[in-house]
Amino acid sequence: MTDYLLLFVGTVLVNNFVLVKFLGLCPFMGVSKKLETAMGMGLATTFVMTLASICAWLIDTWILIPLNLIYLRTLAFILVIAVVVQFTEMVVRKTSPVLYRLLGIFLPLITTNCAVLGVALLNINLGHNFLQSALYGFSAAVGFSLVMVLFAAIRERLAVANVPAPFRGNAIALITAGLMSLAFMGFSGLVKL
């Protein structure tokens, strides 16, 4: 049980996918201008990343390795992610039309999020079992969502702040992301993986 807790804390805080591994920077910078959109993208990404990690592990373990098709791993995982995103879109559309309208634009964007593919590939490279793969995918998504929501809240405050002209827009956003990355480096001694 302690190993799973360490995996969760290590993935969310110490080895954050956005601030440490630099995966998922496109939605991190693009969707984080408003807190509501960042929260919606975070929820959708959490669901997709967790489910894609599980499906990718199952396909790799039950199909690719037994048939010696490991060279198709990246292509297979991209297809798995696309199918999971489409499945998620269909389920959300049928079960909650309000949530579908809220997340409508974000669901197709998750297909191109490199963090989702990165989690699936890292699960295999790190030799995780089924439970570890599911937890790693969920933890990476929680870390992604946490950082994106924090960044969106900071950007909303910066939008009304008196920022010097050369630093307005993307410049102050990149400086803020760098400072957040430095702040998360403070967690580096917390867990040794």
UniProtKB/Swiss-Prot annotation:
Membrane topology annotation: Multi-pass membrane protein
GO biological process, one term: electron transport chain
EC top class named in words: translocase
Keyword annotations from UniProtKB, A to Z: Cell inner membrane, Cell membrane, Electron transport, Membrane, Translocase, Transmembrane, Transmembrane helix, Transport
Main location: membrane
Subcellular location as annotated: Cell inner membrane
Signal sequence region: none
Segments crossing the lipid bilayer: 5-25, 39-59, 63-83, 102-122, 134-154, 171-191
Gene Ontology annotations for the cellular component aspect, listed alphabetically: plasma membrane
EC number(s) on file: 7.-.-.-
Record note on quaternary structure: The complex is composed of six subunits: RsxA, RsxB, RsxC, RsxD, RsxE and RsxG.
Function of the molecule: Part of a membrane-bound complex that couples electron transfer with translocation of ions across the membrane. Required to maintain the reduced state of SoxR.
Family indicated by similarity: Belongs to the NqrDE/RnfAE family.
Protein's UniProt name: Ion-translocating oxidoreductase complex subunit A
